[in-house]
Amino acid sequence: MNEGIHMKTAMKCVWMGVLLALAMPVFADDTQTTYCKIQGQLAETTLIGRYLGKSQTDAMQVVVRATDGMDDAFEQNIFIMLMGEIVDGVYERELMAEPEQHEAEFLAEARGLGKTVHDNCMQMDVKQVLKTMREGYHP
């Protein structure tokens, strides 16, 4: 059972890296659906990583590395800040006891968290949030 957890997690981590790398140009274009999908996927994979003993620092390093190719330093910092909020939220959650004995339950919890984060993101206007933040920093 543990091998199944590790294989699924490895695949999700690889997918998250690819997703974040592909999302950088899309994020710059303020695409709501893609950005919210990234947030949901980050929440899901971060929770799985946490169950497997990955540190919050490890999770943030994934976010920071994903922004390396961004041309706009402001957007890069905003991306790190917003995604950092997702990582922080995951590390504030209570974890179920003995997740290795409840693989299906903790994977369902991670998927549920990802869906909730995605749905909440879709209710906000990402484009307006970024515009407001940019105006606040560059009057």
Which ranges hold each PLM region?
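Bacterial N-terminal signal peptides that target proteins for export
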Residues: I5-W15
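Compact alpha-helical subdomains of small soluble proteins
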Residues: Q61-P139
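N-terminal secretory signal peptides
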Residues: A28-T67
